[in-house]
Amino acid sequence: IKKDMPTVSHEIGQWCVYPDFKEIQKYTGVLKAKNFEIFQETLAEKHLSDLADEFLYASGRLQTLCYKADIEAALRTPGFAGLQLLDLHDFPGKGTALVGDLKPFWESKGYVEGEEYSMFCNQTVPLARLPKMVYLNNESMKAPLEFAHFGAEPLKSASIYWKLADKKGTILQSGSWTKDLPVTNSIWIGNMVCDLSSVQTPQELILTAGIEGTKVHNEWHIWVYPAEEKKITNAPYMTNVFDQQAIDRLEKGENVLLCVSRGALRPEKGGNIKVGFSSIFWNTAWTNKQAPHTLGIYCNPSHPALSLFPTEKYSDYQWWDIVSDCEAIVMDDFPAEYRPVVHLIDDWFTNRKLGLLFEAKVGKGKLMVCGADLLKPENGRMARRQFKQSILNYMTSDRFAPTTTLSVEEI
């Protein structure tokens, strides 16, 4: 590449989303969505049809997060001339490449709209260089703010603002600058700094930056957890092995937390499933099962096991520490109506019922099983520590009351 030749990224992203089976009825001509019909049938065989739209939405939110990360990385790169997506809609061929934010018919899939997308993919984009997305409340957030501006002409004396607020809209800190924005990227604005000591409970915060009097703005979500780890009294028995000691404790009516070690599952029980934070690239049929094999998590955010781990029903960055180092547990042999606390959304070619976290009554006791090994050293993974804290808080409360009974053999 010549020194003065513009460099543009080619077909970045290609992050997949779960199929939207409502599209099937739109194929009224010579082309039929037989692939979707097969995927729909295999989902029904696993008794998960009622979750099809939930899987679409949850995986779609992760897809949007992945595209946002890729696009912002390109816009932050000094001297970079631009980026190209394959398309905004799905590519139905080559193994079924569900990489679009839109249906093949240029219609919304319901999980992201143009207004949100334009925050990070536009001619003028605020860009935060966040060093991390998870903080403790004895830290300060410090994030440099830059702009990429590729409008028709420079912006003179732009009134730039930023704020960090909680989900209720209460502003923790804010700031402003007046800056000229030339036609380029890597335009330095200033540092966004906020002491986080006022955040006394686990919270999701929203960092926003933009230009006053315009639609130009962008936002990022961060998570803040207490630095002091709460002591758990009457903690359950915790183990990596479902051995006779664990069984005996359950038979006596105790609570047990079973954390699956990496590589501990047989292939048919999930050992051959590669879990990652991102969505599937292109599709596994075309890439010969290139990892990852999953499409993020799906959960009920109001489940009491997650009360100290703020989340939506889909993956966001607080899940990175957990799903990037976990096993997917195949639960196809469990009762048809059984649902885990936290699902891992499987590849649509296999449509297995996958669990990351699930609970059951076993013997006289109660069991919680986690596909992430929460017993090994944290090594700075504060989100994983908080996830464990939330689970233990739940298991030591009277809210821990699984409704499904499983036998030792089923476990």
Name each model feature, range by range:
Residues P131-M133, S176-P182, D195-S197:
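Beta-strand-rich interaction surfaces with strong enrichment in secreted/lumenal proteins
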Residues A383-T396:
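Short amphipathic C-terminal alpha-helix that caps PH/PH-like domains
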Residues N234-N283, K364, C370, I391:
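Short alpha-beta junction capping motif
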Residues I1-K3, R262-P267, N283-M382, R399-I411:
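Catalytic beta-strand/loop cores that center a nucleophilic Ser/Cys/Thr
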Residues I1-L164, P340:
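Substrate-binding clefts and catalytic carboxylate motifs of secreted carbohydrate-active enzymes
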Residues W15-V17, D90-T96, I171, Q245, ...:
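Flexible loop/turn segments at secondary-structure boundaries
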Residues K179-P182, K215-K231:
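Short beta-strand elements
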Residues N138-D180, I189-V193, P202-E212:
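Beta-strand-rich binding/interaction modules
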